[in-house]
Amino acid sequence: MENLDDPADRRREWFRYYSEKRVVHQWFQVHLLAGLEDVEKVLEVGPNLGLVTALLVNAGFEVTTLDLVPPRHGLAGVRHIEADLRQVKPETLAGFDCLICCETLEHLPWDAIDDVLARFAASAVPHLVVSVPYQGFQVDARLYLNAHRWRQYFAFKKLNFLRRFRPDDDPEGHHWEIGYRGHSLADFEAKLAAAGLTIERRDFTSPTRSVFYLLARP
């Protein structure tokens, strides 16, 4: 993973990574906490450059981040835990009101996420926000028009359930995505249930296509 100590390098990576659709997608991670009045302390897994971290801090939450690598967010005062999700102990995750793990699980092998979800549940954190890429059947059509400019967007996903997902060549890339053959939404939700997690809310985003869950322990 690239070192971003140089401000110019950081700006280039920031503008490359944070497209409009990705910024809206990351805002939604924070928006799911609206109305959870018992949430003050948040553990964010996989913060990357720290946009969600900064939004959480700005919203008034006490934030700790966790990642396999040292922090890249550059936010003073945000505690960081350097750990592997596949090995982290539940007690390391304990003591928070909410755990956010968005767009991270797909970077692990499919069979490895059962144990990670079980660790989340065993931590006794009362609220969890989880999202993973969703490529199941969906249609997104939109049009913007005024007297000076117009733009349109259209996406139609329909037959991915017939195909196997092709993992990225990058070993740190995606190992799977929901909606492909062998990785259905029902399969993923069965893993959540097996870990002892209850779905309180499920939602979908586009054009960064993901399925989001607000989860709780029964």
Show where each model-derived region lies.
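Conserved N-terminal segment of class I S-adenosyl-L-methionine
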Residues: 1-98, 114-117, 123, 173-217
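A short, conserved alpha-helix within the catalytic core of class I
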Residues: 108-120, 130-132
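C-terminal alpha-helical "lid/dimerization" subdomain adjacent to the S-adenosyl-L-methionine
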Residues: 149-187
